[in-house]
Amino acid sequence: MTDKRKDGSGKLLYCSFCGKSQHEVRKLIAGPSVYICDECVDLCNDIIREEIKEVAPHRERSALPTPHEIRNHLDDYVIGQEQAKKVLAVAVYNHYKRLRNGDTSNGVELGKSNILLIGPTGSGKTLLAETLARLLDVPFTMADATTLTEAGYVGEDVENIIQKLLQKCDYDVQKAQRGIVYIDEIDKISRKSDNPSITRDVSGEGVQQALLKLIEGTVAAVPPQGGRKHPQQEFLQVDTSKILFICGGAFAGLDKVISHRVETGSGIGFGATVKAKSDKASEGELLAQVEPEDLIKFGLIPEFIGRLPVVATLNELSEEALIQILKEPKNALTKQYQALFNLEGVDLEFRDEALDAIAKKAMARKTGARGLRSIVEAALLDTMYDLPSMEDVEKVVIDESVIDGQSKPLLIYGKPEAQQASGE
């Protein structure tokens, strides 16, 4: 088809659908003996979009995975954290079952169950949320609680979270209302003391107050296509009661709050139960005993805790778990780098002692699984820089000495006459 204003005879052209002349429209597109204007094209697109929206819910109705299926999918990508995966699987299943069947069942109103994830850095909080969204094929966005402030102050407005979610689904409100929002670093917006402050705390308690309605469920007015708000503008109305909010944080020091509560009950003075150091619970064991009162002492306001009824705790990853993370998941780090090297026609081998060394380094840095990539990247940097310019390299071998920075990777060449480089 071509864009035409007049045919060869200079005759005035009209849209074959609405009858408007070429002077009344911006574009007139010509086909074999037929014309269509830009306005009719837009109308056709709107009709098709509406048809797709009507068909989509029927596909979704039969596609809700069971908690067992959700857990099995998480197992493919996330190592360990068995209890957290079970809690998440049930909470997510119940949330989308509620959406699918409406907010009421036999006259009983079904409440919304948002989720709070508590666990150290690099334990898999973000990965769990991302994997869930990918499995359910729903829009997903992340927000950093440390950048949020109350409306009217310098910083990011809490409603910007919904705007980001809309951007992920091309401003399709219906899709956005089925999405998942992950708010990271939620522990960083705790108030500075147990008692309500008489001064304004715009990035702590103030943000918690601002998030309350959004998380519980409200109709948020969001400017279309990310424009700034002004009075004459039409807003997109997004019902957040259908959006699943997952909040996560490391909550450093929460274990001490729990420990104090637990040990206070063991008595004082001559009647106290004396515990040896070896009898004391680990950080993970203490976090598993978290109660709302502990979170209040930490600095979250009671109303905010009430909006996050499902709590899942994640343990710090052990050295063995980090080694598993390096090689077992479907998108394991070693598999990713092997795929990159395969694109150059080269095999990449990680020896077992190299994986041990990577895990030890990550443990020493206290960065959890998040620190694994930077360690591997540093070890392979020079090789990835030189490899595209080299010929006849068949294989690259990484051992413990490479990870420790004592030698370069071993390069194995395909031709016998080629010189081998051991990096010694």
Curated annotation (Swiss-Prot):
Binds 1 Zn(2+) ion per subunit. Component of the ClpX-ClpP complex. Forms a hexameric ring that, in the presence of ATP, binds to fourteen ClpP subunits assembled into a disk-like structure with a central cavity, resembling the structure of eukaryotic proteasomes. Interacts with Mu phage DDE-recombinase A; this interaction remodels the viral transpososome for replication. Disruption phenotype: Delayed and decreased induction of the extracytoplasmic-stress response. Its cofactor is Zn(2+). It comes from Escherichia coli (strain K12). SMART domains: AAA, ClpB_D2-small, zf-C4_ClpX. Residues 2-56 form the ClpX-type ZB domain. Coiled coil: none annotated. This is ATP-dependent Clp protease ATP-binding subunit ClpX. It comes from the Bacteria. The keyword Nucleotide-binding applies. InterPro entries: AAA+_ATPase (IPR003593), ATP-dep_Clp_protease_ClpX (IPR050052), ATPase_AAA_core (IPR003959), Clp_ATPase_C (IPR019489), Clp_protease_ATP-bd_su_ClpX (IPR004487), ClpX_bact (IPR046425), P-loop_NTPase (IPR027417), Znf_CppX_C4 (IPR010603). Induction: By heat shock. Part of the clpP-clpX operon, clpX can be expressed individually from its own promoter. Gene3D superfamilies: 1.10.8.60, ClpX chaperone, C4-type zinc finger domain, P-loop containing nucleotide triphosphate hydrolases. Belongs to the ClpX chaperone family. ATP binds at residues 120-127. GO terms for molecular function: ATP binding; ATP hydrolysis activity; ATP-dependent peptidase activity; ATP-dependent protein folding chaperone; disordered domain specific binding; identical protein binding; protease binding; protein dimerization activity. PANTHER family: ATP-DEPENDENT CLP PROTEASE ATP-BINDING SUBUNIT CLPX-LIKE, MITOCHONDRIAL, ATP-DEPENDENT CLP PROTEASE ATP-BINDING SUBUNIT CLPX-LIKE, MITOCHONDRIAL-RELATED. ATP-dependent specificity component of the Clp protease. Uses cycles of ATP binding and hydrolysis to unfold proteins and translocate them to the ClpP protease. It directs the protease to specific substrates both with and without the help of adapter proteins such as SspB. Participates in the final steps of RseA-sigma-E degradation, liberating sigma-E to induce the extracytoplasmic-stress response. It may bind to the lambda O substrate protein and present it to the ClpP protease in a form that can be recognized and readily hydrolyzed by ClpP.
